Amino acid sequence: MATHLFTSESVSEGHPDKIADQISDAVLDAILEQDPRARVACETYVKTGMVLVGGEVTTSAWVDIEELTRNTVKEIGYTHSDMGFDADSCAVLNAIGKQSPDINQGVDRASLEEQGAGDQGLMFGYASDETDVLMPAPITYSHRLVQKQAEVRKSGKLDWLRPDAKSQITFKYENDKPVGIDAVVLSTQHCDSVSTETVREAVMEEIIKPVLPSEWIDGNTRFHINPTGRFVIGGPMGDCGLTGRKIIVDTYGGMARHGGGAFSGKDPSKVDRSAAYAGRYVAKNIVAAGLAKRCEIQVSYAIGVAEPTSISIDTFGTGVVDEKTLVALVREHFDLRPYGLIQMLDLERPIYRPTAAYGHFGRDEFPWEATDKAQALKASL
């Protein structure tokens, strides 16, 4: 029997890098609401008392960057300088310019179907049958821990919790199936007046136990709750935050490969984002159809060219048909040209802000999580 350990981490919506991601996607959504075919590449930097929003935008829309930024920070929960950041008093700097016409001429076409890719690059999609959402268990439960932290914090149940938090889970695998949890790490920001003992006890009872299945926990499972003992200074006061710095948290927790491109702040003409979503859609439908237990797809593009330069699939020995057959099925049932996948997943609309925390995949509310092609894939064999 083959055994191994695998670890993934997640971070909360109050983590500095995630604040940046959420601001970038809030700007994107506000623009897409007015101008669905806008070109947006929005980057955000946050540090003590300051938010810098920059990038390139081509649009007919007008949005109030300062108001959007403050509202986003407020919704996350940074409402007082005692927390290390205050939505009402932080400086908001706007450094947004226009998209280069050299890029634009390679993307826009008279025929929408021939729209070229916004850049070269390679993107991966992945799915696995090890959880109900067809995602790897380590990243799925790491996300659920920090989501629970936010839920408990916002409900007021533990009113001393603060927005910044991180989680990490090490799973035990036997024959590529998760069978238990070896270690759990959860660090959460808290107010100055609460003791470390209180934090550890409450986090275990209110966050960890309600989230992690008891059958995966045993006497050998190790728990590290605020292992440094104190986490009062957090958020942008503790670390600066930058859009696109949590690409493994955003995807599969390291279980699958990554092409390197970040998602947040990018409109769907950027294949870094849209093709990664389409890759997840393809891989999930292949697994949902029972054609493989695990599936990873790679798609690549050239700037200004509509057709993908390559499509390849790896099922890690779990496929019921060979990978060449799967690639042929993908070409038959999925349009992976930039505009084709935008239409397939209905991406030209303001749906991106919620993706910017707790992972872009494994959440049923997003269109790339649908398994509506599974039956057709199965029937094609």
Swiss-Prot record:
One of its GO terms (molecular function) is methionine adenosyltransferase activity. It is found in: Cytoplasm. Pathway: Amino-acid biosynthesis; S-adenosyl-L-methionine biosynthesis; S-adenosyl-L-methionine from L-methionine: step 1/1. L-methionine binds at E56, Q99, D239, K270. K(+) binds at E43. CDD domains: S-AdoMet_synt. Its cofactor is Mg(2+); K(+). One of its GO terms (biological process) is S-adenosylmethionine biosynthetic process. GO terms for cellular component: cytoplasm. The keyword Ribonucleoprotein does not apply. Its main location: cytoplasm. Homotetramer; dimer of dimers. This is S-adenosylmethionine synthase. It comes from Alteromonas mediterranea (strain DSM 17117 / CIP 110805 / LMG 28347 / Deep ecotype).
